[in-house]
């Protein structure tokens, strides 16, 4: 079956640095912990120094440990120069320059259905696109398999803004 995904593969020209907060959770508690962390981060996100504009927010779930627990990260993109300057109360998630990423744009109409469409895109990426691509996941190199990127764009000829969701998959040649 041919994949219907639109996938762009390219090495990162510069490091992408995301500063935020994370928590350790497991599959049983992620639906309680995730929204709580989002509310908490929403209250302190304006304190993040050197945020990149336009604003890009990231969500990443790191690879699980042997006991099934994993780190769930939420943060905003900051300037590359901020990577070497830790900020108290926050941690950084860094995608180094040269990292090969596959970018999948996730189309959706209603914001409430974004998570469902992201899950479908992930499944299609791993089951259809990746095996036939000549690439493999590089999650072991960076500690997470993908990053959800949320940003907004203006609609043409309107003042309204639309949320855009992209998935970044960290890959390498097989």
Feature names for model-found ranges:
Residues 1-174:
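A solvent-exposed interaction/effector surface
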């Amino acid at each position: 079956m041919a994949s219907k995904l639109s996938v762009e593969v390219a090495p990162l020209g510069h490091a992408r640095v995301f500063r935020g907060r994370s928590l350790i959770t497991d599959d049983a508690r992620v639906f309680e912990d995730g929204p709580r962390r989002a509310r908490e981060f929403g209250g302190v996100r304006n304190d993040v120094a050197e945020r990149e504009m336009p604003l890009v927010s990231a969500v990443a779930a790191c690879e699980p440990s042997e006991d099934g627990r994993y780190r769930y990260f939420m943060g905003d993109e900051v300037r590359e120069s901020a990577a070497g300057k830790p900020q108290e109360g926050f941690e950084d998630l860094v995608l180094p320059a040269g990292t090969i990423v596959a970018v999948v744009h996730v189309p959706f109409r209603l914001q409430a259905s974004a998570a469902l469409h992201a899950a479908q895109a992930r499944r299609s990426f791993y089951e259809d696109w990746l095996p036939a691509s000549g690439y493999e996941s590089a999650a072991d190199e960076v500690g997470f398999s993908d990053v959800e990127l949320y940003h907004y764009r203006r609609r043409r000829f309107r003042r309204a803004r639309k949320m855009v969701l992209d998935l970044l998959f960290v890959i390498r040649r097989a």
